[in-house]
Regions:
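Catalytic phosphate/metal-binding cores of nucleic-acid and nucleotide-processing enzymes, i.e., regions
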Residues: 1-72
Length: 72
């Protein structure tokens, strides 16, 4: 219910299922045109899946910064 409420208010909402930090809240609600950076981390030869490409595009369209970081 809260996700739908926030989306109706214009937020891009992400429900976190598993994180690297204990105690992180369940939802991330990002206002349009925010300065959030979403980084998809890959190995130098790692492939970005269609779903990952879709999500990155969705976030870009919402005004967020995105990147594909290739570590090595």
């Amino acid at each position: 219910k809260r996700i739908k409420q926030l989306e109706a208010e214009g937020y891009y909402v992400i429900k976190l299922v598993k994180t690297n930090k204990n105690g992180i809240p369940d939802l991330v609600a990002i206002p349009k045109d925010s300065e959030v950076l979403f980084s998809e981390v890959k190995t130098p030869k790692g492939k970005v899946s269609k779903l990952q490409e879709y999500r990155l595009k969705e976030l870009k369209n919402h005004g967020c910064r995105t990147e594909i970081y290739r570590g090595g």
